[in-house]
Amino acid sequence: MSAATKLHKTSWCALRQLQQYRTKANFSGSSASLAKRNDLFNQEQRRQRDAVGRIDKIEVRYLGLPEDVTLVMNGNISTPFNCAQHLSEGHCKRSALALIDGSVPWDMHRPLQESCTLQLLNFHVSEPHVVNKAFWRTCSFMLGAALNRAFKPEANLQLHSFPGPNIKSGSFVHDIVLQTQNWEPGKEEMRALSAEMVKLAAQDLRIERLDVQQDLAQEMFKDSKYKSEQLPSISQQTNGRVTLYRLGDHIDISRGPMVASTSFLGKCVISAAHKVAEEGPSGAFYRIQGVALPSGFQLNHVAFGVLEERSKKPSPARLPNEPFEEQQQLQLS
């Protein structure tokens, strides 16, 4: 048996033989480097909270049902979710994203910096484009976590990146690298990946955002070849800052925003895996694609089947092997 064939079987079997169900904070990708990445995330999160110092009161003018109301909150501490807690339990459960001053999408768990108007967005608003885009982006982020959970360490899976959301394309995507050029997952393997997405949704994991300096991001991702290569270009476009997101212990790079929790993922299918380019003498880039509905949305089997078939078509997004500097909307979307 050739080395390439052995690698192929390793990655294939690694996906078929899924790790046992893990707790919220213990994905199968856990390792010393992952633990350190999370430690650094936690330390920086605490440092930023402690650096707030004197707490300034801000006025948040909530616009929406049941009525407009002004809330007095704590600047750089209170979040849109905290505002929702002052309104009702329903607002907390339904609000996927916030809109600040009528135009700025804002993560539900991101501290508000100054007085503003606030709208809480769900998937039933009259103009859902903004929240749908955040949902699509979150699906790609969750797919990275699901892939880490599904593949055993010996498969040597490496997450590359996920393109910005393109709802018209019919699929959300995540690009990966495997040390085999012959991976062709079957229905069983794709169902296993879909099941990992469903598990993430059931865990109702809060999605956290953290803006950090490039040097800290480099330290966090120093064991990730592709993330390390991408960070300088990202920070050049964002004044030396890098935006990170975390669910459970899975951390990745994205400018966001994303929806508040994994629980907003409803019916979901990981539908396709396309080899898009070779990487080195034995590896290859693969684009994993899927389609999903927000939780609470119902679609009959036939209609969802049409969406699933459409999502299998190769995504037109820029390919992961193209120079990162040219990918205008890749990780920065």
UniProtKB/Swiss-Prot annotation:
Residue ranges for the region (Disordered) are 311-333
- Any one GO MF annotation of this record: structural constituent of ribosome
Which GO BP terms sit in this record?
A: mitochondrial translation; regulation of translation; regulatory ncRNA-mediated gene silencing
| Alphabetical UniProt keywords | Mitochondrion, Ribonucleoprotein, Ribosomal protein, RNA-mediated gene silencing, Translation regulation
One GO cellular component term of this record is: mitochondrion
Report domain TGS positions: 56-122
Q: Where in the cell is it found?
A: Mitochondrion
Q: Name one Pfam family in it.
A: TGS
InterPro entries found in the cross-reference section: Beta-grasp_dom_sf, Pro-tRNA_synthetase, TGS, Thr/Ala-tRNA-synth_IIc_edit
| Subunit structure and binding partners | Component of the mitochondrial ribosome large subunit (39S) which comprises a 16S rRNA and about 50 distinct proteins.
Record family assignment: Belongs to the mitochondrion-specific ribosomal protein mL39 family.
Q: What is this protein called?
A: Large ribosomal subunit protein mL39
